[in-house]
């Protein structure tokens, strides 16, 4: 086993002796990965660093996709080359047989009923213009089902495998409508529902008899509705949600008797609860998890309809429960490793449950839980995949602890507290700190396995703290909305409060703090650099927003209405003025720390222009800035070869500007 080293002392010394002025960095450009990765101002990566980090970058993970048609194996997603592909596993711990060999990473995968054929979504170069491909694992042949000039997602098979419902922008290039195709006649796909402006439709489940389609409509994080579409007469009826009293409702599946459906809802203004509701008109939900105060994040029902399995998110940690759908009794599955659980899926024989599990010390892998005779009882746990960890001894990896720090405002006359996960290296410190802020913003940092975080802790000797600042999901609806619109910079003030807290911790070094974030987290990096340059050493901005107005004007049409709800409508003069005022690009003179900016050329969410304009403005002012752009990536780096170089460059950046 290879044990992580605490630092690269010789490499740090070499960097300290290498004169690199800001002007030289600005004009030093080189490429790698067949010219697809462009680096400006970034030093060449030393070979010893590449070798040192290889162990972390060789870490793999696996995710469950589907049981095979005969039920004796499963399809998983994992990576052996540069991109994630479909593999088949026949037995617990068995070999992973690669089934697909596409150049691009696979997206969503659903198996055709009664067959091993797979419907797979895939884009090109990270542009998110997904196409739907029908792949036959037996012959290894594939054919395009979508029209190749629109965005197509959420494929869903009918019970007999003859029809495929899906979401597509093919009507006008921007509206996410609901479509239906006969798989043998994909060119004659039918438009089922036109999505009203500012919303999208997506298929969720077919009823067992094939008559009804459960449809999800999404307006924003606070308003999502569920519809029942009768495929006989094409009539549509809202069954959950409301235009007058909006709530978040996520459809999961029909029951197995064609009498009702399951969904996750916060309609009672509290945690997201699991509910069942009849499909008959004018019925009300029956809440199944009223005794649990945490959000339900996942649910699955067995093919015979007798068992259910749901997952809760308890301040970032997952708990798995089994449900007797007849008595409505449930029990928690104990003796599971503490971590994150996702994607529960029952075996066709109804006697096993597959799910993904990640802990702070083990990558995401697939586990199968045998089920007891009593419906809500569990049996033995089997691990089906054992993902490689690059030869590292993961028992040495830092385990995060949950902390809460006070921020600037008050609740019931007491300071509001912000939850955060803290990873610390060995030793008394004081340790340098990297603040890791999540994107979204309607997201949450959860302590899943992260080779990158462990790399920073072990190889740089830094502490890593990941706060769930206001606007994060997983807590309550009030907390989720606390950064909307004109409240945007309150989230930045939560970062300032974290800097105050760091200063009070004897094991943390307040004079050596850097910040890292992607997407909305990239905006927070830039905004923190505006407000707290005197308290930060450096920042890493990955596909971040630099100007809210240009971002909203240039993001893809199908995304714009949803982002306006979160950030504000730039067409409104008052809001436009506010967004201009708080945008980091318009406050670039206040940024006085070195930055590493990372971008994908094909990003449809945060266009590359957002990174290009902040880099240009910083260079104009003589600020140290490293810039990395991948020509074959989008919103983040999916290709391992690109991700490797960017992570290596980030280590160099932190060594030069945080540790020295």
Located regions from the model:
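N-terminal secretory signal peptides that target proteins for export/translocation
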Residues: 1-6
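Beta-propeller blade-edge and WD-like acidic-aromatic loop motif
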Residues: 27-49, 78-98, 117, 121-144, ...
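Conserved beta-propeller blade repeats
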Residues: 58-77, 96, 103-121, 132, ...
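Generic beta-strand/beta-sheet core signal
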Residues: 216, 229, 264, 277, ...
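Active-site-proximal cap/loop segments of hydrolase catalytic domains
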Residues: 414, 467-660
């Amino acid at each position: 086993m290879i044990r992580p080293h605490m630092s690269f002392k010789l490499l740090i010394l070499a960097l300290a002796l290498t004169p690199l002025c800001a002007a030289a960095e600005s004009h030093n450009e080189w490429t790698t990965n067949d010219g697809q990765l462009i680096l400006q101002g970034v030093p060449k990566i030393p070979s010893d660093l590449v070798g040192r980090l290889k162990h972390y970058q060789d870490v793999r993970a696996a995710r469950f996709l589907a049981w095979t048609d005969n039920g004796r194996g499963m399809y998983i997603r994992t990576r052996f080359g540069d991109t994630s592909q479909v593999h088949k596993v026949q037995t617990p711990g068995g070999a992973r047989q690669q089934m697909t060999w596409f150049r691009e990473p696979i997206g969503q995968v659903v198996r055709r009923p009664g067959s091993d054929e797979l419907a797979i979504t895939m884009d090109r170069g990270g542009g998110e213009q997904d196409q739907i491909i029908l792949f036959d694992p037996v012959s290894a042949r594939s054919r395009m089902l979508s029209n190749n000039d629109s965005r197509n997602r959420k494929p869903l098979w009918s019970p007999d495998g003859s029809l495929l419902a899906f979401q597509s922008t093919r009507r006008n290039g921007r509206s996410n409508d609901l479509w239906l195709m006969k798989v043998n006649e994909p060119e004659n796909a039918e438009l089922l529902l036109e999505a009203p402006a500012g919303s999208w439709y997506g298929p969720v489940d077919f009823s067992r008899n094939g008559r009804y389609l459960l449809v999800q409509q999404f307006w924003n994080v606070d308003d999502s509705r569920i519809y029942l579409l009768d495929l006989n007469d094409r009539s549509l009826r809202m069954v959950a949600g409301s235009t007058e009293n909006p709530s978040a409702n996520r459809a999961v599946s029909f029951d197995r008797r064609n009498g009702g459906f399951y969904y996750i809802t916060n309609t009672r203004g509290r945690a997201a609860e699991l509910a069942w509701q009849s499909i008959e008109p004018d019925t009300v939900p029956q809440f199944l998890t009223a005794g649990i105060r945490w959000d339900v994040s996942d649910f699955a029902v067995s093919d015979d309809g007798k068992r259910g399995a749901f997952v809760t998110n308890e301040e970032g940690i997952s708990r798995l429960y089994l449900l007797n759908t007849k008595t409505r009794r449930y029990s928690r599955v104990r003796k599971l490793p503490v971590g994150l659980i996702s994607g529960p899926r029952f075996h066709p024989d109804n006697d096993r449950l597959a799910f993904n599990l990640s802990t702070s010390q083990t990558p995401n892998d697939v586990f199968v839980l045998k089920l007891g005779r009593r419906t809500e009882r569990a049996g033995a746990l089997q691990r089906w995949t054992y993902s490689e960890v690059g030869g590292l001894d993961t028992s040495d990896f830092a385990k995060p602890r949950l902390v809460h720090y006070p921020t600037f405002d008050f609740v019931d006359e007491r300071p509001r507290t912000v939850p955060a996960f803290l990873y610390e290296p060995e030793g008394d410190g004081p340790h340098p700190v990297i603040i890791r802020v999540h994107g979204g913003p309607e997201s949450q940092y959860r302590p899943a396995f992260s080779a990158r975080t462990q790399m920073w802790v072990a190889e740089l000797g830094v502490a890593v703290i990941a706060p769930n600042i206001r606007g994060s999901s997983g807590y309550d609806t009030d907390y989720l909305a606390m950064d909307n619109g004109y409240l945007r910079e309150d989230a930045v003030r939560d970062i300032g409060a974290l800097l105050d807290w760091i200063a009070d911790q004897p094991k943390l070094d307040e004079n050596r703090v850097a910040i890292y974030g992607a997407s909305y987290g990239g905006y927070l990096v830039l905004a923190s650099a505006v407000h707290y340059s005197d308290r930060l050493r450096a920042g890493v901005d990955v596909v971040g927003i630099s100007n809210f107005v240009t971002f909203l004007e240039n993001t893809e049409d199908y995304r714009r209405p949803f982002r306006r709800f979160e950030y504000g409508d730039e067409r409104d003069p008052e809001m436009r003025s506010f967004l201009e005022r708080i945008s980091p690009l318009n406050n670039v003179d206040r940024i006085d720390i070195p930055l590493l900016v990372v971008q994908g050329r094909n990003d449809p969410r945060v266009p590359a222009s957002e990174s290009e304009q902040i880099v240009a403005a910083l260079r104009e002012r003589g600020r140290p800035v490293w810039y990395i752009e991948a020509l074959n990536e989008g919103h983040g780096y999916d290709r391992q070869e690109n991700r490797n170089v960017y992570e290596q460059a980030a280590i160099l950046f932190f060594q030069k500007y945080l540790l020295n």
